[in-house]
A protein has these predicted regions:
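Mature extracytoplasmic domains of secretory-pathway proteins
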Residues: 28, 33-60
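Surface-exposed polar/charged interaction patches
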Residues: 13, 34-38, 59-62, 84, ...
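Generic structural signal for well-ordered, non-transmembrane alpha-helical segments
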Residues: 25, 29, 50-57, 76, ...
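Short terminal alpha-helical segments
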Residues: 1-37
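Amphipathic alpha-helical binding modules
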Residues: 64-104
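Residue-level recognition of alpha-helical structural elements
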Residues: 20, 38-45, 67, 71-74
C-alpha cells in the first residue's frame, strides 16, 4: 500500500494536541495491521472498526482536558484517512456505517 497520510488535517491544526492525534493514529494503524493479515468477512471488518471507533471515543475526555475536542474537523480528518484505506483493501462498507459507533 502506498504510504498512508494519517490525520493530516488534525496534525496541521493546533487545536488538536499532537500527542492525542498520535493516539488516534495508533488506533487506525492497529486496524490497518488487522486488515493486512488477510481476508476477513464484512462482519469481522465492521467489528474491528467498531473497536477502533470506541477506542477513539474513549479519548474524548483527554481532548477536553487539553482544551480540545473531537468535532467536525476531527471527524473529517479521520474519514479522509480511512477512505483511502477502504479503497486499497477493496472494502465496500459505507464510511458512516463503518464509523457507526462514533460519538464525534
Amino acid at each position: 500500500m502506498t504510504e498512508i497520510k494519517y490525520l493530516e488535517g488534525m496534525y496541521q491544526d493546533p487545536f488538536f494536541p499532537p500527542f492525542l492525534v498520535d493516539k488516534i493514529k495508533q488506533c487506525i494503524f492497529d486496524t490497518v495491521q488487522f486488515l493486512e493479515q488477510g481476508n476477513y468477512d464484512t462482519e469481522a471488518i465492521q467489528a474491528k472498526f467498531d473497536e477502533m471507533t470506541l477506542a477513539i471515543n474513549a479519548l474524548q475526555d483527554e481532548f477536553y482536558e487539553n482544551e480540545s475536542e473531537l468535532e467536525t474537523g476531527a471527524r473529517d480528518s479521520i474519514a479522509e484517512t480511512i477512505i483511502p484505506i477502504l479503497a486499497h483493501y477493496k472494502i465496500d462498507i459505507d464510511i458512516e456505517e463503518l464509523l457507526r459507533e462514533r460519538e464525534w
